[in-house]
């Protein structure tokens, strides 16, 4: 695919095969439709690829990274749980230094939640992470 990341089916499979503790992180590109409408889909695609590369560089050794929708990404972390906040800060800092076609990178809203192995806890963590991502996104708009 475009970003060379796993897709939604790979993400769901990875969650089902997760043993032990972990975390799920959701990422949503801020104002992505506006980027496509203003600069065109080629620049939008370049943004997605750059974000995917940034995700790989920060989270790649600690978990698996997936593109689960148009401008939505997910990381399933299974290592370095104590470094989530640090990794999130590093990701945002790297993103702020990047450009695509002379344009600064858009912001990315992030939400995460930790889980253990029980299916109920895992499903709740996914819901919490998703809700947190949208809370952050809404907070940025106001």
Regions found by a protein language model. Name each.
Residues 85-92, 96, 114-142:
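Catalytic-core segments of nucleotide cyclases and related cyclic-nucleotide turnover enzymes
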Residues 67-68, 95-113, 141:
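Catalytic core regions of nucleotide second-messenger enzymes
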Residues 7-23, 30-57, 66-70, 74-75, ...:
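Conserved long alpha-helical elements within nucleotide-processing catalytic cores of c-di-GMP signaling
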Residues 76-77, 114:
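A structural signal for hydrophobic residues in beta-strands of small regulatory alpha/beta folds
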Residues 54-58, 90-101:
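Generic non-transmembrane alpha-helical segments
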Residues 24, 73, 108-112:
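A structural signal for short, well-ordered beta-strand segments
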């Amino acid at each position: 695919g475009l970003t060379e990341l796993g897709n939604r089916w790979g993400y769901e499979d990875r969650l089902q095969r997760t043993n032990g503790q972990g975390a799920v992180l959701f990422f949503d590109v801020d104002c992505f439709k506006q980027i496509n409408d203003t600069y065109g889909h080629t620049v939008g695609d370049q943004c997605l690829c750059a974000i995917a590369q940034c995700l790989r560089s920060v989270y790649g050794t600690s978990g698996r990274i997936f593109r689960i929708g148009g401008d939505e990404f997910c990381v399933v972390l299974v290592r370095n749980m104590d470094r989530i906040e640090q990794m999130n800060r590093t990701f945002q800092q790297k993103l702020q230094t990047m450009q695509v076609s002379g344009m600064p990178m858009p912001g990315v809203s992030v939400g995460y939640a930790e889980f253990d192995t029980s299916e109920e806890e895992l499903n709740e963590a996914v819901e919490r992470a998703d809700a947190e991502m949208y809370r952050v996104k809404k907070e940025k708009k106001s």
